């Protein structure tokens, strides 16, 4: 086979978005080595432009038919395009939030960008991984870069502690997940492509075997750790509290998107004849995540820990769409994931901005902030209320679509739990807003008293202010434009043969 024929057979055009991010990563390293600090002022815009270019190329591939790439190792279907877009969008917003934070910490901005882009590459590859080798390599790429990002503030003891905890728990969860995949590798007779593994296991009559059950349990546990679902969530609040806030912002959405993409592809492909079983397992995970995440969040005094437990509950909400297992379920998961990016990153952006001025993330220290910076309080309130699902904000319509799809699929108890815990979440979100808008001067915290008001000007927007504006606009406008977003999500599911085959199989098993 000639070289050009080999390149053509690999269908590398499907990996062009990842290629752009890789070239961007190397380019940033070369610029830093060549110019050092002389280009620090405009270094921020290089990854932003590169990531936006990658997003444009990615969107142009949406709805394509020839999706397999790299000899079947990568699946560039519309489902993977959606999740890869989410990861790129998360990275763009996090870069906007990080510049001032990293500069204040007197650490290298280039190192932060390189580690973040490496995590982006790992997450994007994981979203389309189609065989065991690609799953392992992309999982470790995402994991290792995330551990390094968590410990990025080398002189901060809390950051170091968070990195060690994340490393140990992440390594354990990866081992558990890989052990489950290795069982399937053995049952299939040595196949590595996930569709071939499923076919071989069914042909050999091992789809209901004890080993398949064990593999399902191990894979479920591994995925539960990756998306911070209860009861495998213990690492999340500690890591969220100790890590640099821009890193936490990315982990809360980017890693969750990659984990959900992996869960959707593995569960619908590898366990088509254990659908009822994995549905039951994930119903338990979703219920525990929504209940424990929201109940424990009530008692938190740290803003980052509160959002950490909130992230656990959000994983439970997202699982409702996965469990529904029909086009509306999958599309509701995609819609809510997109909305969650804006809501959650908007909240973290406000925490970063306040922390830069006040140097604290304790909820009580936000007391009276409305008197000093009413616009920041407004943006923070919009993000929190949207996370709580208050109409007419985007979070309300996202949860409504999720609950409707779950109800239509017959998961009534799960929907009731989601509704009940959403009310609980509104309570602790409103508690934060109440603290910020106290009007009595004597109730104002000492940190707010020292707080210097930021001048918000459209003509002189700082990157973090632009990031906050985009997130708040997303949280508001996405509620107005929710119908077009739902239509795009439904088309994404329609263009993904994997999800269509899964639905047909579920109907066959039901009847």
UniProtKB/Swiss-Prot annotation:
Q: Does the keyword Ribosomal protein apply?
A: no
Catalytically driven reaction(s):
a plastoquinone + NADH + (n+1) H(+)(in) = a plastoquinol + NAD(+) + n H(+)(out); a plastoquinone + NADPH + (n+1) H(+)(in) = a plastoquinol + NADP(+) + n H(+)(out)
Q: Where in the cell is it found?
A: Plastid, Chloroplast thylakoid membrane
GO MF terms held by the record: NADH dehydrogenase (ubiquinone) activity; quinone binding
Q: Which UniProt keywords apply?
A: Chloroplast, Membrane, NAD, NADP, Plastid, Plastoquinone, Quinone, Thylakoid, Translocase, Transmembrane, Transmembrane helix, Transport
In terms of one coarse class, where is the protein primarily found?
plastid
The topology of this chain with respect to the membrane is: Multi-pass membrane protein
**What is this enzyme's class at the first EC digit?**
translocase
EC no. given is: 7.1.1.-
Concerning Pfam families, the annotation shows: Ndh2_N, Proton_antipo_M
Per the record, the coiled-coil ranges are none
Q: Where are the transmembrane segments?
A: 15-35, 39-59, 78-98, 108-128, 132-152, 167-187, 210-230, 244-264, 278-298, 306-326, 334-354, 377-397, 410-430, 466-486
**Job of this protein:** NDH shuttles electrons from NAD(P)H:plastoquinone, via FMN and iron-sulfur (Fe-S) centers, to quinones in the photosynthetic chain and possibly in a chloroplast respiratory chain. The immediate electron acceptor for the enzyme in this species is believed to be plastoquinone. Couples the redox reaction to proton translocation, and thus conserves the redox energy in a proton gradient.
Q: Which HAMAP family match?
A: NDH1_NuoN_1 (MF_00445)
> What family is this protein classified in?
Belongs to the complex I subunit 2 family.
The subunit structure is: NDH is composed of at least 16 different subunits, 5 of which are encoded in the nucleus.
What name is this protein filed under? NAD(P)H-quinone oxidoreductase subunit 2, chloroplastic
> What organism is listed for this UniProt entry?
Chlorokybus atmophyticus
Its ancestry begins with: Eukaryota, Viridiplantae, Streptophyta, Chlorokybophyceae, Chlorokybales
């Amino acid at each position: 086979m000639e070289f050009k024929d080999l390149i053509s057979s690999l269908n590398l055009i499907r990996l062009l978005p990842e290629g752009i991010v890789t070239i961007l990563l190397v380019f940033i390293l070369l610029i830093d080595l060549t110019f050092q600090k002389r280009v620090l002022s405009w270094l921020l815009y290089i990854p932003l432009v590169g990531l936006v270019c990658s997003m444009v190329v990615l969107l142009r591939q949406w709805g394509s038919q020839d999706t397999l790439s790299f000899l079947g190792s990568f699946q560039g279907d519309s489902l993977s395009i959606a999740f890869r877009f989410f990861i790129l969008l998360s990275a763009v917003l996090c870069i906007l939030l990080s510049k001032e934070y990293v500069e204040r910490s007197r650490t290298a901005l280039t190192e932060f960008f390189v580690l973040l882009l490496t995590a982006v590459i790992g997450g994007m590859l994981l979203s389309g991984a189609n065989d065991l080798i690609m799953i392992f390599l992309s999982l470790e790429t995402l994991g290792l870069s995330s551990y390094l990002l968590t410990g990025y503030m080398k002189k901060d003891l809390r950051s170091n502690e968070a990195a060690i905890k994340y490393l140990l728990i992440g390594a354990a969860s990866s081992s558990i997940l890989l052990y489950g995949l290795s069982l399937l590798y053995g049952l299939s007779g040595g196949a590595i492509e996930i569709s071939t593994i499923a076919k071989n296991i069914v042909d050999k009559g091992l789809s209901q075997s004890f080993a398949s059950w064990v593999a399902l349990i191990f894979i479920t546990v591994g995925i539960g750790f990756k998306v911070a679902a209860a009861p495998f969530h213990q690492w999340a609040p500690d890591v969220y509290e100790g890590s640099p806030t821009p890193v936490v912002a990315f982990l809360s959405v980017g890693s969750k998107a990659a984990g959900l993409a992996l869960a959707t592809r593995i569960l619908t492909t590898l366990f088509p004849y254990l659908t009822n079983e994995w549905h039951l397992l994930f119903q338990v995970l979703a219920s525990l995540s929504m209940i424990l995440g929201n109940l424990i969040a009530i008692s938190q005094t740290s803003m980052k820990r509160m959002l950490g437990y909130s992230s656990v509950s959000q994983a439970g909400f997202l699982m409702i769409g996965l469990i529904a297992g029909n086009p509306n379920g999958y599309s509701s998961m995609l819609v809510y994931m997109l909305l969650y990016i804006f809501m959650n990153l908007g909240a973290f952006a406000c925490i970063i901005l306040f922390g830069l001025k006040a140097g604290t993330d304790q909820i009580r220290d936000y007391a009276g902030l409305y008197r000093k910076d009413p616009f920041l309080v407004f943006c923070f309130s919009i993000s929190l209320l949207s996370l709580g699902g208050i109409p007419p904000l985007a979070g309300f319509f996202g949860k409504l679509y999720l609950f409707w799809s779950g109800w239509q699929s017959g998961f009534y108890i799960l929907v009731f739990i989601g509704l009940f815990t959403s009310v609980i979440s509104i309570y602790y979100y409103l508690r934060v807003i109440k603290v910020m808008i106290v009007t009595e001067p004597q109730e104002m915290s000492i940190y707010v008293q020292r707080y210097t008001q930021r001048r918000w000007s459209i003509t002189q927007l700082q990157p973090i202010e632009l990031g906050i504006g985009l997130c708040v606009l997303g949280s508001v406008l996405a509620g107005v434009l929710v119908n077009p977003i739902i239509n795009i999500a439904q088309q994404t599911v329609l263009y993904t043969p994997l999800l269509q085959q899964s639905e047909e199989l579920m109907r066959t098993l039901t009847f």
